[in-house]
Design a protein with these regions (language model features):
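Short, positively charged and aromatic/hydrophobic N-terminal segments
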Residues: 3, 13-17
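Active-site-proximal beta-alpha core segment in soluble small-molecule metabolic enzymes
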Residues: 9, 21-24, 29-32, 45-171
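Conserved PLP-enzyme active-site core in the AAT-like
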Residues: 40
């Protein structure tokens, strides 16, 4: 069954490298889609909207507040910098960053409440060493060779995190 969105109103436009091209982002369509998904999954299910890469070029600073008001519970981004930028832009919803390097702005991100995914034993040790309270997820390598804690390090990684009183593993 196809749903017809409501009349569209708010539009955000951004130019591209070629002046003949223009992208028009319909914020009311985005809000409609978020409301529809939330309606379908039910209020007990948390909805994370992934807005990495500036909301895939849609403009995260404009799109995220619309998604939040339409029912998005939290947001996912790739990097700590993206997460901190959203927080600085006034986003107070939970934000999860799942790809980060040990030299990145970890302490700043944790200080402003960014949830992170741990992808390695080294990252687990860095979180413990930071002594900053953190809510985290552990991403495990399951054979796709993308990112995540290697199988050989699973036990030690979970032990390191479990033994740290300032770290809460959410998933």
């Amino acid at each position: 069954m196809r749903h017809t969105p409501p009349e569209f109103g708010k539009r955000v436009s951004s130019g591209t490298m070629v002046s003949m091209l223009k992208t028009t982002i319909d914020l009311s369509a985005i809000a409609y889609n978020v409301r529809l998904i939330k309606e379908k999954v039910g209020p007990e299910v948390k909805l994370m909207c992934v807005v990495k890469a500036d909301a895939y070029g849609h403009g995260a600073a404009k799109v995220v507040p619309v998604m939040a008001s339409a029912g998005a519970d939290c947001f996912g981004v790739a990097t700590l910098r993206e997460a901190v930028e959203l927080r600085r832009a006034g986003v107070d919803s939970p934000i999860v960053a799942w790809i980060w390097q040990t030299e990145e702005i970890l302490e700043e991100a944790l200080a402003c409440g960014i949830e992170v995914a741990v992808n390695s034993l080294e990252q687990a040790h860095q979180l413990v060493k930071s002594e900053i309270p953190a809510e985290i997820y552990v991403k495990v390598e399951t054979g796709m060779h993308r990112a995540g804690v290697d199988e050989d390090d699973w036990v030690e990684t979970f032990k390191v995190l479990r033994d740290a009183p300032h770290i809460k593993v959410l998933g």
